[in-house]
Amino acid sequence: MNKQSWLLNLSLLKTHPAFRAVFLARFISIVSLGLLGVAVPVQIQMMTHSTWQVGLSVTLTGGAMFVGLMVGGVLADRYERKKVILLARGTCGIGFIGLCLNALLPEPSLLAIYLLGLWDGFFASLGVTALLAATPALVGRENLMQAGAITMLTVRLGSVISPMIGGLLLATGGVAWNYGLAAAGTFITLLPLLSLPALPPPPQPREHPLKSLLAGFRFLLASPLVGGIALLGGLLTMASAVRVLYPALADNWQMSAAQIGFLYAAIPLGAAIGALTSGKLAHSARPGLLMLLSTLGSFLAIGLFGLMPMWILGVVCLALFGWLSAVSSLLQYTMLQTQTPEAMLGRINGLWTAQNVTGDAIGAALLGGLGAMMTPVASASASGFGLLIIGVLLLLVLVELRHFRQTPPQVTASDS
């Protein structure tokens, strides 16, 4: 592939066997988690007929994920990362087996579903942090942009496929099949992950885990560059919560049930296009400025989304948001990995991923509050333009990020 091409270069999957193993394991894992994501709310709704109970399970799992990201960040900086990844995946699979056995009971236990949701949320996120911290060692820091784009495509593809498979399984075999196949898929991911090389953490003094986590917070707050990246990531995730307004906006546009699906597909489609056309991003001399501008553009797209007179134009705005947010997210990921010291990678990746989880929840809550006081159109526009104003202020304040320059990585013959 020509080094000037906009298209994503997939050569890492050929030249880096360890990354290829991670790619395969991640795809299987995403499909497995997707089967779980369909089954849990359906089972709870069937048992309780309560949307509140369904929401409670999501909240509990999200809380466990947040704690798991914090703990996983500390563990990834203290212990051999391959062992942490394998332990987390295996333990997570045990929880899926528990859900399967519970579903096979004549009267499944609701409490067991909640407790196993906590178990799986914690251990799943614990492994994610260790894997993120290990990625620079697996592909080299010069290939992080390419690895991030391939990973983004994996996530998007798996997120599209798994709900469809999960729905078919629910229609034919019930939730136990979803849980059983999710468990099988999780244990299958251990096979490629076993081929990974040893991933020891960098040498550093031993300290109390809480003190170690606080050191990560202090680094994040003290670094204008890394802290600014994390802040932008949180705001971008808040903007993506606009999906909670889709049903109300669909009524406003008088959309059919089939047409509503286009709203939900638009952002993932835009993000996939962003990942596929990210070939030149790694060669940007000023990635910080590009990150800021793409983030501002994504906020503008959300602000305009609700104002569109036709739903098809709203879909275009959402796809544009998906594309711009993908560009910003890839730059965030790459700069975070390259500008964070090796000894801090686990904790900073954990904090960065955690702000994605909390940013989405905060954004959904704020939009829900706005929706109670304003029309859906006004709520969507207010959120987008409000974030745009904050983004412009950050463009002025984050001077170090705005002026950051990097030397574009050298492209070898194998990459061309």
Curated annotation (Swiss-Prot):
User: What UniProt keywords apply to this chain's record, in alphabetical order?
Assistant: Cell inner membrane, Cell membrane, Membrane, Transmembrane, Transmembrane helix, Transport
CDD domains attached to this UniProt entry: MFS_MefA_like (cd06173)
Identify the GO cellular component terms for this protein.
plasma membrane
What are the GO MF terms of this UniProt record? Answer: efflux transmembrane transporter activity; enterobactin transmembrane transporter activity
Consequence of gene disruption: Mutant is unable to secrete enterobactin efficiently. It secretes little, if any, enterobactin, but elevated levels of enterobactin breakdown products 2,3-dihydroxybenzoylserine (DHBS) monomer, dimer and trimer.
Function according to Swiss-Prot or TrEMBL: Component of an export pathway for enterobactin. Overexpression reduces intracellular arabinose concentrations.
Q: What is this protein called?
A: Enterobactin exporter EntS
Query: What organism, scientifically named, is this protein from?
Result: Escherichia coli (strain K12)
What taxonomic ancestry is recorded? Bacteria, Pseudomonadati, Pseudomonadota, Gammaproteobacteria, Enterobacterales
